[in-house]
A protein has these predicted regions:
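Aromatic-lined ligand-binding clefts that engage carbohydrates, nucleic acids, or primary amines
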Residues: 101-114, 136
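Short loop/turn segments that connect beta-strands within beta-propeller blades
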Residues: 214-217, 253-257, 318-322, 369-373, ...
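Blade-terminus and WD-like Trp-Asp/Gly-His loop motifs, strongest in beta-propeller folds
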Residues: 130, 184-192, 228-238, 271-279, ...
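Cap/lid segment of the alpha/beta-hydrolase catalytic domain
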Residues: 532-655, 662, 696-701
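Accessory carbohydrate-binding/adhesion or oligomerization-edge regions at the termini
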Residues: 20-78, 135-169
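Non-catalytic accessory segments flanking enzyme active sites
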Residues: 181-185, 192-197, 204, 281-285, ...
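Active-site-proximal cap/loop segments of hydrolase catalytic domains
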Residues: 609-816
């Protein structure tokens, strides 16, 4: 008996066996036979009045895992069915594809069978598969002594391949699933690590676990679902749990597992433990005045943001007495920035909100004596600082801020330039005389996270180093900064032992996911402790990722990189996707990202990622180009880079280039189309079309304009706000342009896409608008992210691969 199933597959990559039209599947992986027996018939029918039949044995649950590990063999070498008893058999083969198509699967020479595609049983006559390597398993039943050798063939109007290799294509599913590192903490003595693992599962479920491991051996000594951290003195780890009398603070010895309840009835809120473990410093929230829901007054532009009226304050909880002593009071936000190594002092920060002058938020830093509560003001209302740390002896304070902080002592820009408020610098203040020394004024990377190590007195920090997150050591006595040699391009987080020369960190690179390391700070050599990437990418073939830089017509070196398809053939022509942000930050070399570049490359694209003017990580003068330019410099760099890349790489089809950007990058997508016609398709996600409406309506519109449009306002600088807005240049756009937007985007409101889409429709231009319901600036919902990403894939397939089938399947043409 013959059964036929029609599958809509993505078909196109040539591997071992390739065909258009008809393909006989002549080789498989086989597992079996698995004997199954007729059950005891206690009745002649079941609860649905159906009699037992041998065909029901096909529904016997059977794991598909074994067949995936079996060797490949020819179809005519399948083993015969057992002479006695019924048996189940598994046959598996892989179909690989990079483009959307349709295929018809023909199964014959077997009566009872089931088909699984990518691990899921299908009984549909028609189904759609996305581009990738698809595991197809035929599960069939044989009767006693029956000679069964199924035949499978595929008919298609597209091109596809029978994949017989050990590697497969990287897909969106790979980007969305698996176990990643979400944090690493080294114990004070350096002997143990706390590693936080986040596992993303199918259907949007996730699981977080905290593991305590021996640093040298990797042996796991504890695993918990509660968040855990290290006690600073004892070296135990601690967590908070609900007890009979309220919240309990519990410490556990990693060596023995012995638990000790430190405090009962612990107040709610976030806290830090003092170095001597004698008190907790809380940052608590006081709720602000409420308004009626049906009608309400907005007292400040930021009052539209949920929780803006709430204020934080600081309190000290004495672990011996249980006394909670408020340390700050007022209507301004206050929080703990650091505690001195001896626990005698704390650095508190207070923010002041003002309208009428840039910057609209000011920060003060106070040094408070924890015994007397006496306060010393270190910094008073500076709008350009963000963080402060004590030196080990508390005689100096390390301050993090932008170049304009502390009177502009760290500025290093050209005359007429305003520094980027996103470009993060380090400053050293002597507490005794308040003398400030800029530590990174001529240091091009932009500081991210920083710690002052108690063990060796050195300052360690990560920084945006072009498109990498590099790890550095700074000697506070000499000011010398040293780049530490680590195996990863992106150091995502690090932790220092207080009493030993040990660092732990984790990172990733453009071609691998997370790996966890430790480093002996005396030897300065990183040692791999766990390779999560190896598990995530097992059996996956990635295309190459290479650096490609060019010298612009202005004389600047503009950095970039590109990704090639996994089965790249230099003799062929490939469409290309150009990706950029174009705003205040570079597009870093993360492997795990909302825009998985390897997944684009796996669909047959060359992907060029460019770092145009205005990004941090290249020096203050470079990042200052983001200020009061609204697309100038950036557009020139992207256009020039794209043209030069095509000229330098003959395998790129210069007539099939697409571009993609989000947020400020979405604005750049729109703005670019008013400047050039080199793109065959463009996509703007959550892009700004009118700087004035974004400035006034977005939650952070006016405050972000303090960065990008310093001291410029719509009424005072219409040339910047109007002439640089794509909406007022819509008639210049002729590129097919897709707008994507979350329906509840509070950062860049959805109206930014709607009004630009409306303009292009009125102009009769090729455009589309897709709104993702219930999503904000980023598309985080599991199922919606898949649809959103597939929309991007389908739009590019339509215009860059001349294949509209995927787009039409998702968004069928309508006659309205």
């Amino acid at each position: 008996m013959k059964k036929e199933f029609l599958f809509a597959c993505a078909l196109g990559l040539s591997l071992t066996v390739q065909a258009k039209g008809h393909l006989d599947i002549t080789s498989y992986r086989y597992a079996g036979p698995y004997l199954v027996s007729r059950p005891l018939l206690v009745d002649s029918t079941d609860v649905n009045a159906k009699a037992w039949s041998a065909a029901s044995l096909l529904k016997t649950p059977l794991s598909l895992d074994a067949v995936g590990q079996a060797p490949v063999s020819d179809a005519d070498k399948l083993p015969s069915a057992p002479a006695e008893g019924y048996a189940l058999h598994l046959m598996q083969f892989d179909l690989e594809n990079t483009a959307y198509g349709k295929a018809k699967f023909n199964v014959s020479e077997v009566k009872d069978w089931q088909l699984y595609v990518d691990g899921k049983l299908t009984d549909k006559q028609e189904m759609a598969l996305e581009p990738g390597t698809h595991e197809v398993v035929l599960k069939y039943l044989s009767a006693p002594g029956e000679s069964v050798k199924p035949k499978v063939s595929v008919d298609s109007d597209g091109e596809f391949s029978l994949h017989q290799g050990q590697s497969r294509l990287y897909t969106l599913a790979d980007a969305m699933h698996g176990t990643k590192c979400a944090g690493v903490q080294v114990s004070p003595d350096g002997k143990y690590l706390i590693v936080t693992y986040l596992t993303s599962l199918k259907e949007g479920r996730s699981e977080t676990v905290y593991c305590v491991k021996e640093t040298l051996t990797g042996k796991e000594v504890a695993r918990r679902s509660e968040a855990i951290r290290w006690m600073p003195l004892s070296g135990d780890y601690y967590f908070v749990r609900q007890g009979v009398s309220g919240r309990q603070l519990v410490s556990v010895s990693p060596a023995t597992g012995f638990e000790r309840v430190i405090a009962e009835g612990l107040p709610e809120g976030n806290f830090s433990i003092s170095p001597a473990e004698d008190y907790l410093l809380y940052t608590l929230v006081q709720e602000g005045p409420k308004e009626r829901q049906e009608i309400y007054e907005v007292i400040d532009p930021d009052d539209r943001q949920p929780g803006w009226r709430n204020r934080t304050y600081v309190a000290k909880y004495d672990l011996k007495s249980g006394l909670m002593q408020p340390l700050t009071f007022g209507y301004r936000n206050a929080w703990v920035s650091d505690i001195s190594a001896d626990g005698r002092e704390a650095l508190l920060m207070v923010s002041t909100h003002r309208m009428g002058k840039r910057p609209t938020t000011l920060f003060s830093v106070y040094r408070m004596d924890m015994q007397t509560l006496e306060v010393d003001t270190l910094v008073e209302e500076d709008g350009f600082i963000s963080h402060a740390l004590f030196a080990p002896d508390a005689r100096q304070v390390l301050i993090q801020g932008s170049p304009e902080a502390l009177g502009g002592v760290g500025m290093n820009v050209e005359k007429g330039q305003t520094p980027s408020m996103i470009d993060s610098q380090l400053f050293l203040m002597n507490v005794a005389d308040r003398k400030v020394t800029p530590l990174t004024r001529t240091f091009n990377p932009s500081v991210r996270s920083v710690q002052w190590n108690l063990s060796d007195g050195q300052i360690y920090f990560t920084a945006e180093n072009r498109d990498c997150y590099s790890l550095y050591r700074l000697d506070p006595s000499s000011g010398k900064i040293t780049l530490l040699d680590v195996p990863e391009e992106m150091v995502l987080a690090f932790s220092l032992a207080d009493k030993a020369p040990v660092m732990a960190f984790y990172g990733e690179s453009a071609a691998n996911s997370h790996r966890i390391y430790t480093m002996n700070l005396k030897k300065q050599k990183a040692e791999l402790r766990e390779d999560l990437s190896e598990k995530l990418l097992k059996g996956i073939r990635l295309g190459r990722c290479e650096d490609w830089n060019f010298v612009s017509s202005r004389g600047d070196t503009i950095y970039g990189r590109y990704y090639l398809p996994p089965y790249f053939d230099e003799s062929k022509k490939y469409p290309m996707i150009v990706y950029y942000y174009g705003g205040c930050s570079p597009t870093s070399r993360n492997f795990d990202t909302l825009y998985p570049f390897h997944a684009y490359a796996a669909q047959g694209y060359v992907v060029y990622v460019v770092q145009p003017s205005g990004a941090t990580g290249f020096g203050q003068r470079f990042s200052a180009r983001h200020v009061n330019t609204f697309g100038d410099y950036v557009a020139d760099d992207i256009i020039e880079g794209t043209k030069k890349f095509v000229n330098a790489h003959p395998y790129v089809n210069g007539k099939k280039i697409g571009c993609l950007g989000a947020s400020y990058g979405g604005f750049m997508t729109q703005y670019l189309q008013t400047k050039t016609d080199i793109f065959a398709a463009a996509i703007s996600h959550a892009g700004i079309s009118d700087h004035t409406s974004y400035w006034g309506e977005g939650y952070w519109g006016y405050s972000y304009s303090e960065v990008s449009g310093a001291n410029s306002y719509p009424w005072a600088n219409p040339e910047l706000f109007v002439d640089h807005s794509p909406l007022y240049n819509a008639d210049k756009i002729h590129t097919p342009l897709l707008f994507l937007h979350g329906s509840v985007d509070t950062n860049v409101p959805v109206g930014e896409s709607i009004q630009m889409y409306t303009a292009l429709k009125l102009l009769g231009r090729e455009t589309a608008l897709v709104v993702v319901d219930g999503q904000n600036h980023h598309i985080r919902d599991y199922s919606r992210r898949i649809l959103w990403q597939n929309t991007i894939f389908a739009w590019f397939a339509k215009w860059l691969q001349d294949d509209a089938s995927w787009w039409n399947a998702m968004y069928p043409p309508k006659t309205l």
